[in-house]
Amino acid sequence: YEISACLVGSEMCIRDSTLSEPGYDMMIGDKTLINCLLEPIDASVGLLSWSTTNDRVATVDADGLVTAVGAGEAEIIAQDPLSGLSASIAVKVVGEGVVSLSLSYVRNQDELKALGWGFGQTPASVNFDAEGMTVNMSLQSNSKYRADLKMASNDRPVVLNIGTYRYLAFRMDVPGNGSLKLDTNKGDYGNNPTGVLAEDSQVIYYDLQAKPYFPTDAPSDKLTTFQLKIADVTVQPYSYKVYWVRTFKTLEDLKVYVEKENNK
């Protein structure tokens, strides 16, 4: 919308605002900063009042940072308190059939275990920081290093909806060599990922439809084995760092997500 510029005391009304949707379905635990273009250009996002129509689905803070807290749909509203005019976007949060975890929000192995995640072999050490999780792998009896990343357990099984969310992506610093094998109790996806994102070499992804393990027209069975086997490492670094793990509908959605993450 367009309205005339106005001054109230020393405060300026915003005469135009445009909010950009995330560009992908959000998942529980996701955080995204809504891109807001304002006119006049010297107007500040701090002038806006933010709200949500459903705080059980998504919350929003004073800077326009949206946090997905539950499955469903919500509308995020940015309003200029002086003029009363507003702009809004729709946000969809998916609860089942997906995988989503930012390791920057995990502080220790107890929290990781509470999420149903863990390791196939006991690592030499695991360190958490504001960016993610660094795993120092353990030496095996074959004189090679290994530490599989487990993303499911008997207590916290995984259900996949690969008909809709086809791609599983990891942002990670991989070890010096060895193999990366995505494995489930239905079968594995080979020794290497489907591809590496051209726009960001730290992002590897798997096409979950590449093997006929799961239906594409219905959710999968509950998986208690869902892991990335990281093995046979013989050159340094004997470690890997994971920033986030997530499923996506399309590679374009993945690219949009990566661009937003890189521009934080």
Q: What are these model-derived regions, one by one?
A:
Residues Y1-I14:
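Short, small-residue-biased leader/transition segments that mark boundaries at the very start
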Residues S10-E11, S86-G95:
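C-terminal edge beta-strand
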Residues S17-V45:
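Solvent-exposed, low-complexity, repeat-rich "mucin-like" stalks and linkers
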Residues P40, D80-L82, D232-T234:
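Surface-exposed loop/turn motifs at beta-strand-loop junctions within extracellular Ig-like
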Residues D42, L47-V60:
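Short, solvent-exposed loop/linker segments at beta-strand-coil boundaries, enriched for Pro/Gly
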Residues A62-A74:
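Extracellular/luminal low-complexity segments enriched in Ser/Thr/Pro
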Residues G72-G84:
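A short beta-strand micro-motif common to beta-rich folds, especially ectodomain repeats
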Residues G95-K264:
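Beta-rich carbohydrate-recognition modules and glycan-binding surfaces
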